[in-house]
Amino acid sequence: MMNGYDKQEALEYILKRIHAKDHPELADHLPELISQTIDADMAYMHEHHVIDEDGNAGTEYYEDDEAFEYMVEKLAEENDLDPVKAVKLASLVDDYMDYQQEYLESKGLVDWDDE
């Protein structure tokens, strides 16, 4: 997990902003899916050296498109989703990424490199 990151606080922050009406097929499972998405996001960051094993900044940059694909594939597999539900999940992950970024910025946990 990323140093300074509070998963429960992030989960609550994100769930307050994601509307069940926007994801009706997944609405009954939003808390579990967002929790799994956070875990998949952190796994992506560790595996791709965005954060190191101690939770500090790693040697690589976060690649949004790559992370998005990683999370969707991981969650679709973990939840045994058919292709139609996987597409619905992709929409949820897209929303998650927006609100996760907002959360990270609100906590001062992201640093934008101008290069």
Predicted regions and their residues:
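Short, flexible helical or helix-coil boundary motifs
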Residues: 18-25, 41, 45, 49, ...
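Amphipathic alpha-helical interaction modules
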Residues: 22-70
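Hydrophobic membrane-targeting and insertion signals
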Residues: 1-20, 113-115
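Amphipathic alpha-helical binding modules
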Residues: 76-115
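An amphipathic alpha-helix signature
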Residues: 7-16, 31, 35, 39, ...
